[in-house]
């Protein structure tokens, strides 16, 4: 592709072409002068253009190069004193020839004010002849010449005097009346409370407990948040926490003279016989009037007609006088060739082992990678031998299934479980399904206390990490192996162990756990407290243990930031509790389709402070586990004092749970607990987590 571009270079024409012409001379400005000013200028001009010619007599000789001074007034303001220093001089040369050389003097563009006495002197100088008839050594006065030996002092022009300005009379300085109120209020000290609080940089270990004990009684800490009341949803509710309004107690010495003075002044204000003139003696600022806006008078310049003609802008008037050759001499047309490169279209590579999915409801995209694992023959043989040694019955059943059973199992998988499957069907999954079908024919799940998932894991169908947990015979059925902790427990054993225990329920999840709460409080005297806790836990068993229920189907889901669905909730609970019990609910379909999900959850939640339990999605299993947790870790709180409970709002505002606050007030008061934290006593420190300890230390270092 070729494009033509027209380039215009600088022309060699005159500067007047196409713009303003360069003015040959300076612009003239007309200034209006009065008659008196015109007369003074004429007199000064005639004096400067006619230099003095001084000739000498035979007796006195000639004078060459004598200097005669002309003192000039400096421009000063009305308030400034005039101090004239004679600096610039005019040299008057003795010229013998008649006006052969005319001297050019520098003109001082200053406005001079001449009085009548000085005008007489200028008129005398004008009428002075070129040659002097009187001798030079004589002094000239107004009446004549006097005998004196001075050198030409009479040529010195006297200093021009200026008229005196009017003196600006200052404002009268009136004596101010003394005000009793102003004198009394000025003696008071000003005290201010900042709107924000600060925290000292010193560590808590450098604090002296004696100072804290002395200053603790002077202040009373109150809750800032709006009033709330903590209710007890049980039959044995004994306490009702209520908040009080915010107040500050400041103790002032009784012998404070300044405060007595202020009270005395306030009594005078409400006294009917108090003199009202005292209010008018208070100093007030002087009011200033608004100054009128000065209008700017713009100066008008008068230009001559010739200058106005040159300022007319006609760019084409001069160009028409030039020839075409002169115009197009500096104009060239250049040809440039360029090519357009097409953009390469890039397509996303499609992987043969993945499926791209689109969710029409959530308007999101996703992909699933598909893979097939090839089982090793040696590993399968060793695994079958170990299975036969552990459980002979299950091993015989897994080895005796025929081809018809395999075909039927494949047909069942392809028809019913295909929409929900997560990976390809392998030999391990097929063997697990066949084992489950044959086991259901021989045994019933309701007769045994072991669930189906524990049976599969104990039989060795899919691997799982064995974690030993100490159990008691009163809770579990000791006939079966307890290597995996997702079995149901008996109801009758736990009903007697939860009497007079106290737990807390999260107020945000009361509707979700309504059936569980009704079942726990139905046949037992259990204290149940509702607390609007910020965490995601369902129940709080004691001051350091909570129960959190999650769904196995949502565990591997990702949030918008890329983290797992329950990642943030579990981390927040670990900062507030020393033990977190996680109940994982799963369905029969997930157990059949994706058995690897269980050991992935177990591996991800592998922590010394986290206990994981897998149960079916039924309320009865969850109620049994809650009774077990209450019997094992819950406490009864009956030793609190009413004085200590009144200060519970301070610790609740720090994010502490209600059971932790009641545990603290069983052994400490609020002041004693603060002192124990400052001294870092082990008994008080063990109750709190690291996050709770930092918040409490920050409160203790609070200062105004």
Swiss-Prot record:
One GO CC annotation, please? Answer: chromosome
Molecular function GO labels: DNA binding; nucleotide binding
Q: Which domain of life is it from?
A: Eukaryota
Gene3D superfamilies, per database record = 3.40.50.10130
Q: Does the keyword Nucleus apply?
A: yes
**Principal localisation:** nucleus
Keywords, A to Z, come to: Cell cycle, Chromosomal rearrangement, Chromosome, Chromosome partition, DNA-binding, Meiosis, Nucleotide-binding, Nucleus
A single BP term in Gene Ontology:
meiotic cell cycle
Disulphide linkage map:
none
Protein location: Nucleus; Chromosome
Inducing or repressing factors: During meiosis.
Assembly and oligomerization: Interacts with ZIP3.
Q: Which family does it belong to?
A: Belongs to the ZIP2 family.
Role, per record: Required for initiation of meiotic chromosome synapsis. Involved in synaptonemal complex formation, a structure that tethers a pair of homologous chromosomes along their lengths and plays a central role in recombination and homolog segregation during meiosis. Required for the normal localization of MSH4 to chromosomes.
This one is known as Protein ZIP2
Source organism (scientific name) = Saccharomyces cerevisiae (strain YJM789)
The beginning of the lineage is: Eukaryota, Fungi, Dikarya, Ascomycota, Saccharomycotina
Name of the gene encoding the protein in the UniProt record: ZIP2
């Amino acid at each position: 592709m070729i494009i033509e571009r027209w380039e215009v270079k600088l022309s060699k024409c005159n500067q007047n072409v196409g713009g303003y012409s360069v003015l040959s001379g300076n612009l003239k400005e007309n200034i209006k002068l009065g008659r008196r000013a015109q007369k003074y200028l004429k007199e000064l001009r005639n004096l400067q253009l006619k230099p003095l010619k001084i000739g000498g007599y035979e007796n006195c000789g000639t004078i060459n190069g004598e200097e005669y001074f002309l003192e000039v007034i400096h421009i000063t303001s009305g308030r400034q004193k005039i101090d004239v220093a004679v600096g610039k001089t005019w040299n008057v040369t003795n010229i013998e020839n008649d006006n052969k050389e005319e001297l050019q003097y520098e003109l001082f563009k200053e406005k001079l004010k001449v009085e009548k006495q000085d005008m007489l002197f200028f008129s005398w100088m004008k009428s002075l002849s070129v040659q002097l008839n009187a001798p030079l050594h004589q002094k000239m006065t107004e009446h004549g010449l006097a005998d004196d030996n001075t050198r030409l002092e009479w040529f010195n022009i006297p200093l021009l005097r200026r008229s005196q300005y009017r003196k600006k009379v200052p404002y009268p300085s009136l004596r101010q009346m003394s005000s009793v109120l102003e004198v009394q209020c000025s003696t008071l000290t000003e005290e201010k409370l900042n709107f924000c609080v600060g925290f000292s940089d010193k560590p808590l270990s450098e604090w002296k407990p004696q100072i804290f004990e002395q200053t603790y009684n002077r202040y009373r800490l109150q809750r800032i948040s709006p009033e709330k009341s903590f209710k007890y949803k049980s039959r044995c509710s004994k306490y009702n926490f209520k908040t009080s309004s915010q107040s500050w107690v400041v103790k002032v010495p009784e012998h404070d003279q300044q405060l007595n003075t202020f009270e005395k002044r306030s009594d005078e204000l409400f006294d009917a016989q108090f003199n009202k003139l005292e209010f008018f003696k208070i100093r007030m600022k002087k009011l200033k009037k608004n100054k009128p806006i000065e209008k700017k008078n713009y100066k008008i310049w008068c230009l001559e007609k010739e200058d106005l003609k040159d300022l007319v802008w006609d760019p084409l008037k001069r160009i028409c006088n030039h020839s075409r050759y002169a115009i197009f001499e500096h104009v060239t047309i250049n040809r440039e060739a360029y090519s357009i490169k097409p953009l390469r279209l890039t397509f996303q590579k499609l992987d043969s082992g993945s499926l791209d999915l689109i969710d029409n409801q959530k308007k999101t995209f996703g992909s699933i990678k598909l893979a097939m694992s090839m089982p090793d023959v040696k590993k399968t043989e060793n695994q079958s031998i170990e299975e036969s040694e552990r459980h002979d019955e299950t091993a015989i059943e897994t080895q005796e299934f025929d081809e018809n059973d395999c075909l039927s199992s494949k047909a069942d998988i392809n028809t019913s479980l295909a929409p929900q499957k997560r990976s390809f069907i392998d030999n391990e999954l097929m063997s697990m399904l066949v084992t489950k079908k044959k086991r259901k024919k021989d045994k019933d799940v309701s007769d045994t206390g072991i669930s189906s998932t524990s049976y599969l894991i104990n039989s060795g169908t899919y691997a799982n990490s064995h974690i030993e947990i100490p159990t008691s015979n009163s809770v579990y059925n000791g006939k079966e192996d307890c290597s995996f902790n997702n079995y149901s427990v008996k109801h009758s054993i736990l009903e007697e162990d939860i009497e007079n225990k106290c737990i807390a329920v999260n107020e945000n999840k009361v509707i979700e756990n309504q059936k569980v709460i009704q079942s726990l409080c139905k046949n037992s005297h259990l204290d149940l407290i509702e607390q609007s806790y910020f965490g995601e836990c369902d129940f709080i068993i004691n001051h350091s243990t909570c129960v959190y229920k999650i769904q196995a189907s949502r565990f591997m889901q990702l949030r918008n930031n890329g983290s797992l669905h329950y990642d943030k909730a579990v981390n927040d609970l670990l900062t507030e509790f020393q033990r977190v019990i996680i109940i994982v609910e799963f369905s029969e379909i997930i157990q059949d389709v994706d058995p690897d999900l269980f050991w992935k959850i177990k591996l991800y939640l592998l922590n010394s402070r986290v206990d994981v339990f897998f149960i079916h999605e039924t309320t009865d299993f969850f109620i049994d586990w809650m009774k077990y947790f209450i019997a094992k870790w819950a406490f009864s709180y009956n030793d609190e004092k009413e004085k200590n409970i009144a200060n519970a709002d301070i610790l609740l505002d720090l994010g502490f749970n209600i059971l932790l606050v009641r545990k603290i007030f069983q052994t400490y008061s609020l002041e004693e607990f603060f002192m124990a934290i400052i001294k870092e006593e082990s008994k008080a420190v063990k109750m709190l987590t690291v996050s709770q300890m930092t918040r409490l230390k920050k409160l203790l270092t609070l200062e105004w």
